[in-house]
Amino acid sequence: MSPQTETKAGVGFKAGVKDYKLTYYTPEYETKDTDILAAFRVSPQPGVPPEEAGAAVAAESSTGTWTTVWTDGLTSLDRYKGRCYHIEPVAGEDSQWICYVAYPLDLFEEGSVTNMFTSIVGNVFGFKALRALRLEDLRIPPTYSKTFQGPPHGIQVERDKLNKYGRPLLGCTIKPKLGLSAKNYGRACYECLRGGLDFTKDDENVNSQPFMRWRDRFVFCAEAIYKSQAETGEIKGHYLNATAGTCEEMIKRAVFARELGVPIVMHDYLTGGFTANTTLAHYCRDNGLLLHIHRAMHAVIDRQKNHGMHFRVLAKALRMSGGDHIHSGTVVGKLEGEREMTLGFVDLLRDDFIEKDRARGIFFTQDWVSMPGVIPVASGGIHVWHMPALTEIFGDDSVLQFGGGTLGHPWGNAPGAAANRVALEACVQARNEGRDLAREGNEIIRAACKWSPELAAACEVWKAIKFEFEPVDTIDK
């Protein structure tokens, strides 16, 4: 070795590469109440032991890099490093492990979901020593969650604003999602709201296209809201999508919505980004607007069981970033979602305190302290025959959203809305009388058809529609 490259052991530094597990695998570590805890599903490359793989995840998502560096000596790695503190095999898998990592709180900027994800999932998912990696869950300590505003208003404030209690709320996504003029779009909203729905909704990709500019849509939808409110005596809303190409444009659209006096706006939080979403959530709280969140792009991230990030993590992140509603799947409709797993992250959205429950995919006990809850939105391929199951699964604090299940009614939009409202009221009344919706649901709907011709027509149209596919992402048995 030449004098120029010789390591000077006397100064406490030894150049070269050493196994991650020597520094970052610490099974003796006792987690702190202030640590952010992560559960990763790790699939190492052949020949890589799980301890090395778990330690590599901890290192590359915190203070580590591929080689020893001089500047390690200028800080306290013991204070700042992530630690892989526990590893367990995945049931039924030969080469998968759940690796638990603890991160010191000081690694993260206060009130920034963007920074949290940049650290925990920003770089390590491309690591060559791993065949696949999935973030299954996070434990967010109150010391960190209290640095976030969270939802602009929350469930109770929304009910008070709408003056609607004791039942799920009803919505409808306007279809076709693209191509309607602003006036025809507003007319469709009016018919649905007049027929009995609480909300209508922009689809996720309705922004400001040549066939319908955002300002025109906002004006005609506001007209629909005010006209339907005057006729029904109920407070109505339309999720006006404020998502835009820049944060400045997004806020401009939200400001215009507020000037129109509408109750709620909408954002695509994954395609729009967490920084934009948190900005909009702060504006909505300051200005009395509810915020509906669409999860467009989520399945790119969360659908595959072995790689990516589970939706329960995205749901927790949304609760911190801010939103009053978020789409959560339906269990019974056309979109992915196993029942117990869906109920697990629905509780993480709504409840203050959620116990660890691996049977529902919840890896950590989560205490949200006083952070407001988020209403889950069941949307995607649902119709009146699903109403008993949806009411039983999601309960009162939910939005049940029927797009094609409203607009596809043979008699038109308003009868479609009336059919859904009658079906919902029948299910809520039956539940309150002590009847079993899971067992008696079809009977309850058939009985309601006798005094609602709109519901009878809807039941006839969709009597044979089913989406019988097994979910891709399931709980480990």
Curated annotation (Swiss-Prot):
Q: How is the cofactor bound?
A: Binds 1 Mg(2+) ion per subunit.
Cofactors, names only: Mg(2+)
At the top level, the lineage of the source is Eukaryota
Q: What GO biological process terms are annotated to this protein in UniProt?
A: photorespiration; reductive pentose-phosphate cycle
Recorded catalytic reaction(s): these are:
2 (2R)-3-phosphoglycerate + 2 H(+) = D-ribulose 1,5-bisphosphate + CO2 + H2O; D-ribulose 1,5-bisphosphate + O2 = 2-phosphoglycolate + (2R)-3-phosphoglycerate + 2 H(+)
Residues that make up the propeptide are 1-2
Annotated site residues (Not N6-methylated) in this chain: 14
Residue positions of the PTM N6-carboxylysine? 201
Modified-residue entries (N-acetylproline), positions: 3
Q: What's an example of a GO molecular-function annotation for this chain?
A: magnesium ion binding
Site residues, Transition state stabilizer: 334
Localization (cell): Plastid, Chloroplast
Modification after translation (UniProt): The disulfide bond which can form between Cys-247 in the large chain dimeric partners within the hexadecamer appears to be associated with oxidative stress and protein turnover.
Pfam families noted in UniProt? RuBisCO_large, RuBisCO_large_N
In this chain, Mg(2+) is annotated as bound at: 201, 203-204
Which PANTHER family does this one have?
RIBULOSE BISPHOSPHATE CARBOXYLASE, RIBULOSE BISPHOSPHATE CARBOXYLASE LARGE CHAIN
Assembly, per entry: Heterohexadecamer of 8 large chains and 8 small chains; disulfide-linked. The disulfide link is formed within the large subunit homodimers.
* Name of the protein this chain belongs to: Ribulose bisphosphate carboxylase large chain
Taxonomy, top ranks, is: Eukaryota, Viridiplantae, Streptophyta, Embryophyta, Tracheophyta
